[in-house]
Design a protein with these regions (language model features):
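N-terminal ligand-binding/catalytic initiation module
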Residues: 1-113
């Protein structure tokens, strides 16, 4: 399936441009936008208000250093991430991720789903 609505297709194109190299995030946004097509067709005011553009852009994203000492007494340094998409209806969902394989695209994917 692909995005047929012109407005949603433009939003998706912008997401890809603004978030290059984040295929997991692109996939999550594509799936959500495809599911929203009937809603957007019935509610053109959502486009006028830029609703979807606001949904797909995180309110904030934090990356931070986590230093810890392993069992051998050696200090390890990892990067932690937190992404927050939308607080309009209450607290943010999501959590913190510290695994070395995690990067911003994965965090956005997890936070957006």
């Amino acid at each position: 399936m692909s995005i047929k609505n012109a407005y949603l297709a433009r939003v998706m194109e912008d997401v890809v441009k603004r978030n290059p190299g984040e295929p997991e995030f692109h996939q999550a946004v594509t799936e959500v936008l495809e599911s929203l097509e009937p809603v957007i067709e019935k509610n053109p005011e959502f486009e006028e208000k830029g609703l979807i553009e606001r949904i797909v852009e995180p309110e904030r994203m934090v990356s931070f250093r986590v230093s810890w000492t392993d069992d051998n007494g050696k200090v390890q340094v990892n990067r932690g991430f937190r992404v927050q998409f939308n607080s309009a209806i209450g607290p943010y969902k999501g959590g913190l991720r510290f695994h070395p394989s995690v990067y911003s695209g994965i965090i956005k994917f997890l936070g957006f789903e």
